[in-house]
Amino acid sequence: MKLALTFLLILMILPLTTGGKKSDNQALKRLGARKFNENLSELNSACDDAWETCAWSRTCCSRNCCRGICVSRYYECP
């Protein structure tokens, strides 16, 4: 009888502990996504600054650390 009660108690507690881990993982993913977006906006502003200096020349693509963003936002690089 004690064994059955113990087993039942474990079955009741188990979803509570795994649910906490799941929400922690989701919180970490949201935090990672927020950090990624912050980094992306920094890259975008750096690219905007570089774009103003190089105007319509194609040097923005190769000279700065924002190659993919410049390409997707402005024009294709050779």
Swiss-Prot record:
It is found in: Secreted. Residues 20-33 form a propeptide. Pfam families: Conotoxin. Expressed by the venom duct. Its main location: secreted. Keywords: Cleavage on pair of basic residues, Disulfide bond, Neurotoxin, Secreted, Signal, Toxin. Disulfide bonds join 47-61, 54-66, 60-70, 65-77. Residues 1-19 form the signal peptide. Transmembrane segments: none annotated. GO terms for cellular component: extracellular region. The keyword Disulfide bond applies. GO terms for molecular function: ion channel inhibitor activity; toxin activity. The cysteine framework is XI (C-C-CC-CC-C-C). Belongs to the conotoxin I1 superfamily. This is Conotoxin Cl11.1.
